[in-house]
Amino acid sequence: MTERRIPYSEIFYSIQGEGRYCGAPTVWLRLFGCNLNCDGFMQDDLDVPESWSLDYKDADLSNVKAMGDLPVFQRGCDSSYSWAKRFRHLAPKETAGIIAGRLRDLLPGRAFRHPTSAQDAHLAFTGGEPLMQQPAIMAVLDALRDSGDAPNRITVETNGTRPLSKAFADYLKRMLEESGKEW
């Protein structure tokens, strides 16, 4: 059986800038796909959609070979490259094991626990809408756990419109029970 290949827009390392883990070193997996279209961001007149400038629709893609070649869009969704159909061909598609390795490669000492300070790094799933790929999130977390390096801090940045599947909720419950942490 062929292992499922997961479409994503980017993997990167930075400092978390908001929420509970603000200030924490964070490795990010931006999954491809979203169920919303938020074209109104940064538009001059939100009441007149026909006046909106949509950079992601107007961008010249003739020299774009990878996600990293795309310009930074100033209006509309700030991560339209992670869901717009015209960019889907640019999304890498890799197995959970390869993605887990890429996430670890960005961390000091290739580990979620810093080799010197013992500070925990944070893993954030974002998008698009990551809850459209709940099986992918579980597969990546399983691959990290199987490697002996599961993160202690995990965030799923969601737009709140997608329910957790029973399988994902049960998975998270098991994960938390095994860790001794509370919801």
PLM-predicted stretches and their roles:
Residues 1-23, 27-34, 39-54:
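N-terminal cysteine/histidine-rich coordination modules
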Residues 6, 36, 40-177:
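Conserved Radical SAM active-site core
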Residues 177-183:
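Histidine/lysine/aspartate-rich catalytic loop segments that bind and position anionic ligands
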